[in-house]
């Protein structure tokens, strides 16, 4: 059948949006790859999506206001760039404030890496993140597990990385954390915790901060953020060996991004 000029134009118009979608997808994938290659989190775990393996625990220890959440968000964004789902559990911090952390860190990361901060790139990451909030006084690990189970079993959201931000380690947690360890292995999740320490507090018997010492055996990785003068040092307490060329890591006080002190 002979196509008229009008028919050919109409067919081309239908193909054009599809071609643009493909081109846009490739461009977004290229930007993601650039961010992964230039992400400062790779100093901790290489260019993999996470420092931990399935079923493992990691802790970021520091005093209040030093940068625990900022480092957590960098780890989460690295996982999201690899298209792996993240659940960020925040205690006593509303969804909009947690989301603001992600927007600010993503903006700093994009600018530092020289990658255009396009709205499409940001929007492509959001399906891989779920923010869950609790009031600290009503929170319990079993309650969190119940909500996570509902999400996973109904296939609403299946996380590979779980962040628990704001849980107090000043109270006994061994039994609850042991149960969560089993839960994370069952569902193939890696779990990161922020652990708040206190000024002028003696370390535990192992030399680790008191908040970690009673449950240290449950953690495969522990990182401490230590203010020294105007710098915030990133110190590995357990489970990681930094590359020789990146052995001195700090948090940039302006952007709160991990950076190589010697760079």
Which residues are covered by each model-predicted region?
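P-loop (Walker A) phosphate-binding loop of NTP-binding proteins
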Residues: 63
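Pre-Walker A adenine-sensing motif
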Residues: 39-51
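Phosphate-binding/switch region of NTP-binding enzymes
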Residues: 196-263
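Conserved P-loop
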Residues: 71-129
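Structural recognition of the conserved hydrophobic beta-strand(s) that form the central parallel beta-sheet
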Residues: 165, 190-199
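Phosphate-binding/switch loop-helix module in NTP-utilizing enzymes
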Residues: 130-186
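Pre-Walker A (Motif I) flank of P-loop NTPase domains
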Residues: 53-58
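Conserved lysine of the Walker
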Residues: 68
């Amino acid at each position: 059948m002979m196509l008229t000029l009008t028919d050919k134009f109409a067919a081309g118009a239908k193909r054009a949006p599809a071609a643009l979608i493909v081109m846009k997808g490739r461009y977004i994938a290229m930007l993601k790859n650039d961010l992964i290659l230039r992400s400062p989190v790779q100093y901790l775990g290489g260019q993999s999506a996470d420092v931990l393996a399935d079923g493992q625990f990691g802790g970021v220890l520091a005093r209040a206001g030093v940068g625990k959440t900022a480092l957590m968000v960098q780890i989460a964004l690295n996982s999201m760039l690899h298209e792996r789902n993240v659940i960020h559990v925040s205690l006593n911090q509303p969804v909009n404030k947690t989301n603001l952390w992600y927007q600010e860190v993503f903006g700093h990361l994009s600018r530092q890496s020289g990658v255009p901060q396009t709205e499409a790139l940001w929007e492509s990451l959001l399906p891989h993140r779920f923010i869950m909030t609790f009031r600290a006084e009503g929170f319990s690990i079993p309650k969190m597990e119940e909500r996570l189970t509902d999400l996973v079993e109904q296939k609403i959201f299946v996380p590979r990385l779980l962040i628990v931000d704001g849980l107090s380690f000043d109270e006994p947690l061994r039994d609850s954390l042991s149960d969560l360890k089993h839960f994370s292995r069952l569902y193939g999740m890696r779990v990161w915790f922020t652990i708040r320490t206190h000024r002028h507090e003696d370390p535990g018997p192992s030399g680790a901060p008191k908040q970690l010492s009673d449950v240290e055996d449950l953690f495969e990785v522990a990182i401490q953020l230590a203010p020294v003068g105007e710098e915030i040092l990133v110190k590995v307490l357990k489970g990681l060996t930094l590359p020789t060329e990146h052995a001195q890591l700090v948090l940039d006080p302006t952007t709160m991004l991990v950076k190589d002190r010697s760079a």
